C-alpha cells in the first residue's frame, strides 16, 4: 500500500516536472518571434529619431532568437566605427551616464529604507508641533514652579471658558435679534397686504352734475392705474382766469350764509345770454368778489323772496348773502355797498326764470336800509312795498 502510494507520488512529481520544464511548442515560439521582430522595429525607429533630433551617433546591436545579428544603422562600417570609438574610451567614461538594471534595482532598495525613516520622523514631528505634551524646560522646574504653572494653566482655562460662554451668548442674542427682525418684517408685510385688501374694498363717491346723482368709484380702480385721470370738468363748472375771488363756497352747492355778500364790486359787461335755467354758467373775467356763496343755490328756506312770478324759487338768490347782485338789497349784513354797474345786460332770453330785461347804467346805490328787499321792474322802479 505504501509502495503504491510512493510510486503514485513519484509519478505525479515526475509528471509535474515534465509539465513545468516542458519546451514551448512551435506555435508559442513563433508568436514570441513575431513579437520580438515588432519590438526590434520599434527600437530601431526610436534610435533613428534620437539621432536626428539630438544630432548624435546612435548604434543598436541586437541578436535574434536564432543568433542572427541585427544592427542600426544597417551599414556595418558605421556600426564598427561607433563601436571602435566606444572601445577606445576609458572605463570611467564608459560607465559615465550608463544605467545597469542590476545596479538600478539595488539603488532603489537601498534608498527605500532611508525614505521610510524620513517619513516616520516627519510623522512623529507633526503631532509634537501641534499638540506638545511636554517641554524640556519643565525638567528643571521645582515643585513650587510646577504648582505655579498649574495655577496659571487653570486661570487661563477659566478665562477661556468664560470667553466661550460670552461668545455663545452673543451668538444667541444675535440669532434672537435676527428672528425678531424677520418676524417684524413678516408682520409689516401682512399689515401692508391687509391695508391693500381693505383699500380695494373702500369706495369713494363722486357727485355727477349731469344727472344729479352720486356715482361710486372703488379706490382700487384709481390705484391700479396711476396714469388714469378723472373725467373732464364740464364747461359749465369751469372758472375762467383773471378772477379774484376769496371764497367759492356754495358755487356748486346749497346757499351759504356769508356775511359780506358783494362789497364794492365793479361789474363790466356781464352778459346773461340765452340762459334756459339760471344765470350764465361762466364767471365773468376781471370780477372781484369776496364771496360767491349761493350763486347757483336756492334760498335757505325755499321761499320766493321776489314777487316776480316769472322767477322760480330755485333761481332765487340768497337774500341773506348775495341779494344785491342785480341791484336789489336783501336782508344780508352788507348787500352791495357803493356798487357801480356798467353795461350789465341781461340779454332778452327765452328763459322764464331769470330777469328778461336790460338794466343799463344804474347809478351808484348806497344801501341804508339793510333789512329791506326791493323788486325792480324794467324801468328800474321798485314794485315791492317798503
Swiss-Prot record:
Residues 29-76 form the MADS-box domain. One of its GO terms (biological process) is positive regulation of transcription by RNA polymerase II. Keywords: DNA-binding, Nucleus, Transcription, Transcription regulation. One of its GO terms (cellular component) is nucleus. The keyword Transmembrane helix does not apply. The keyword Transcription regulation applies. PROSITE patterns: MADS_BOX_2 (PS50066). Disulfide bonds: none annotated. It is found in: Nucleus. GO terms for molecular function: cis-regulatory region sequence-specific DNA binding; DNA-binding transcription factor activity; DNA-binding transcription factor activity, RNA polymerase II-specific; protein dimerization activity. Interacts with MEE14/CBP1. Probable transcription factor that may function in the maintenance of the proper function of the central cell in pollen tube attraction. PANTHER family: SERUM RESPONSE FACTOR HOMOLOG. This is Agamous-like MADS-box protein AGL103. The lineage of its organism: Eukaryota, Viridiplantae, Streptophyta, Embryophyta, Tracheophyta.
Amino acid at each position: 500500500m505504501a509502495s503504491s502510494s510512493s510510486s503514485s507520488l513519484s509519478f505525479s512529481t515526475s509528471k509535474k516536472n515534465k509539465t513545468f520544464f516542458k519546451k514551448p511548442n512551435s506555435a508559442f515560439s513563433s508568436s514570441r518571434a513575431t513579437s520580438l521582430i515588432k519590438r526590434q522595429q520599434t527600437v530601431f525607429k526610436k534610435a533613428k529619431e534620437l539621432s536626428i533630433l539630438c544630432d548624435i551617433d546612435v548604434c543598436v546591436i541586437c541578436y535574434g532568437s536564432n543568433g542572427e545579428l541585427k544592427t542600426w544603422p544597417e551599414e556595418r562600417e558605421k556600426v564598427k566605427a561607433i563601436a571602435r570609438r566606444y572601445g577606445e574610451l576609458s572605463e570611467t567614461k564608459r560607465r559615465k551616464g550608463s544605467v545597469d538594471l542590476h545596479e538600478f534595482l539595488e539603488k532603489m532598495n537601498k534608498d527605500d529604507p532611508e525614505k521610510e525613516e524620513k517619513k516616520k520622523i516627519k510623522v512623529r514631528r507633526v503631532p509634537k508641533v501641534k499638540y506638545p505634551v511636554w517641554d524640556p524646560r519643565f525638567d528643571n522646574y521645582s515643585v513650587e514652579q510646577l504648582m505655579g504653572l498649574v495655577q496659571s494653566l487653570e486661570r487661563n482655562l477659566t478665562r477661556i471658558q468664560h470667553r466661550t460662554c460670552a461668545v455663545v451668548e452673543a451668538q444667541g442674542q444675535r440669532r434672537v435679534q435676527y428672528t425678531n427682525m424677520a418676524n417684524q418684517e413678516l408682520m409689516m408685510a401682512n399689515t401692508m397686504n391687509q391695508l391693500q385688501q381693505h383699500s380695494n374694498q373702500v369706495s369713494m363717491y363722486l357727485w355727477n352734475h349731469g344727472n344729479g346723482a352720486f356715482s361710486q368709484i372703488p379706490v382700487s380702480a384709481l390705484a391700479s392705474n396711476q396714469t388714469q385721470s378723472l373725467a373732464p370738468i364740464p364747461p359749465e363748472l369751469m372758472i375762467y382766469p383773471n378772477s379774484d375771488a376769496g371764497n367759492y363756497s356754495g358755487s356748486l352747492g346749497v346757499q351759504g350764509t356769508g356775511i359780506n355778500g358783494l362789497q364794492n364790486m365793479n361789474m363790466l359787461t356781464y352778459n346773461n345770454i340765452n340762459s334756459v335755467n339760471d344765470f350764465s354758467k361762466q364767471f365773468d373775467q376781471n370780477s372781484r368778489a369776496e364771496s360767491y356763496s349761493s350763486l347757483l343755490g336756492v334760498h335757505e328756506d325755499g321761499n320766493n323772496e321776489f314777487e316776480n312770478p316769472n322767477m322760480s324759487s330755485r333761481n332765487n338768490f340768497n337774500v341773506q348773502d348775495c341779494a344785491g347782485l342785480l341791484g336789489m338789497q336783501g336782508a344780508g349784513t352788507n348787500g352791495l355797498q357803493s356798487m357801480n354797474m356798467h353795461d350789465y345786460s341781461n340779454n332778452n332770453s327765452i328763459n322764464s326764470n331769470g330777469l328778461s330785461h336790460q338794466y343799463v347804467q344804474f347809478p351808484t346805490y348806497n344801501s341804508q336800509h339793510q333789512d329791506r328787499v326791493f323788486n325792480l321792474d324794467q324801468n328800474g322802479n321798485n314794485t315791492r312795498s317798503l
